[in-house]
Each structure stands twice: as structure tokens, then as C-alpha cells.
Curated annotation (Swiss-Prot):
Keyword set includes Transferase: yes
CDD domains: PRTases_typeI
Catalytic activity: AMP + diphosphate = 5-phospho-alpha-D-ribose 1-diphosphate + adenine
Keyword Transferase: yes
SUPFAM superfamilies, sorted: PRTase-like
Subunit structure: Homodimer.
Family of this protein: Belongs to the purine/pyrimidine phosphoribosyltransferase family.
Principal subcellular localization: cytoplasm
InterPro entries: Ade_phspho_trans, PRibTrfase_dom, PRTase-like, UPRTase/APRTase
A GO CC term assigned to this protein in UniProt: cytoplasm
Protein's name in the database: Adenine phosphoribosyltransferase
Length: 172
């Protein structure tokens, strides 16, 4: 089922820097049939669960999270890099290869009792997704799990996400 999707993801060597092979998902997005197949596959996986909120991780997570939320009848919210959200936020810091990064969430975006799905395009090391998941838990919400278009399994990112459900449509 995902063969057409996999075929549309292209490898771009040495981007954004030498030695990295970037997974370019834009051909998946530009083809309406392939994009629909991806959204439908996400929805099929999560439709049996009561999902109250779907969080999209900046920025490509937004692309998938919004239509998933719509199809599931859930609210959509976003986590962004510091200083990008206009209202009061909470922040979660995570480790990078050299230094640290951070994500922020509006304090009123999710609350106690909400059942939350975190969505991003690619699971690599798990740092960003893990930070988003910790924001969910800090707000007293239930982290249902994570959904990714693709997982770079050789980076072992799923191990960084604890016992939460991890659903990746494709694995590389």
C-alpha cells in the first residue's frame, strides 16, 4: 500500500550539510493521490482511539497533523521553536548533537484529560518528538502516541520515546 509513497520520497545527498542524506517528502505532498493515501493511512490507524487533540511539530508536522485532526474530529494545535507563538507558553528543552533545542506550546492548547496524538514527518533521533510528548504530559494530558510518515530506524529514535505507541508509515 505504501509502495507508491515510498517511491515518491527522494534522497538528496549532502543536504542540509555534507554527509547527510535528506529524505525529501515534497513529491508526496504535491501528488494529490499519494497525499490522500498518506492521510487516509494515518486516520485508519488512529480512528479507533478517542483523540481529542492532534499536535503538529514545526514545521512539516503541521502538514499532516491538520488533516488528520480534521478527519478524526479532533482539535489541532502546534508546537514551535521558542519565540514563535504569540501567547503564554511552556517550554521543553531537548539535546541536539552539539547543544540543545527547545519547543514551546501555548499553555491553553491542551489540558488535563485530553487524549493527544503527536505528529511529525520524520522520526530521526527522537529528540524533537520526545520534547513534544513531554509537553503533553506536563499539561496533564494523556499522550496516546506518535505518528510519523517515515522513520529512520538506524537512528533508534523510537527508543527515545519511552513506552508510547509509535506508528510510522514507512521505515528506512
Amino acid at each position: 500500500m505504501m509502495d507508491a509513497v515510498r517511491a515518491r520520497i527522494r534522497d538528496v545527498p549532502d543536504f542540509p550539510k555534507k554527509g547527510i542524506v535528506f529524505k525529501d517528502i515534497t513529491p508526496v505532498l504535491s501528488d494529490p493521490h499519494t497525499f490522500r493515501e498518506v492521510i487516509d493511512a494515518f486516520v485508519e490507524r488512529w480512528k479507533g482511539e478517542r483523540v481529542d487533540k492532534v499536535i503538529g511539530i514545526e514545521s512539516r508536522g503541521f502538514i499532516f497533523a491538520a488533516p488528520i485532526a480534521y478527519a478524526l474530529g479532533a482539535g489541532f494545535t502546534i508546537v514551535r521553536k521558542p519565540g514563535k507563538l504569540p501567547w503564554e507558553t511552556i517550554r521543553e528543552v531537548y539535546a541536539l548533537e552539539y547543544g540543545e533545542g527547545a519547543l514551546e506550546l501555548h499553555i491553553d492548547a491542551i489540558g488535563p484529560g485530553d487524549r493527544v496524538l503527536v505528529v511529525d514527518d520524520v522520526l530521526a533521533t527522537g529528540g524533537t518528538a520526545g520534547a513534544a510528548g513531554r509537553l503533553v504530559v506536563r499539561q496533564g494530558a494523556e499522550l496516546l502516541g506518535y505518528a510519523f510518515l517515515a522513520e529512520l530506524s538506524f537512528l533508534n529514535g523510537a527508543r527515545q520515546l519511552g513506552h508510547a505507541k509509535v506508528h510510522s508509515l514507512l521505515t528506512f
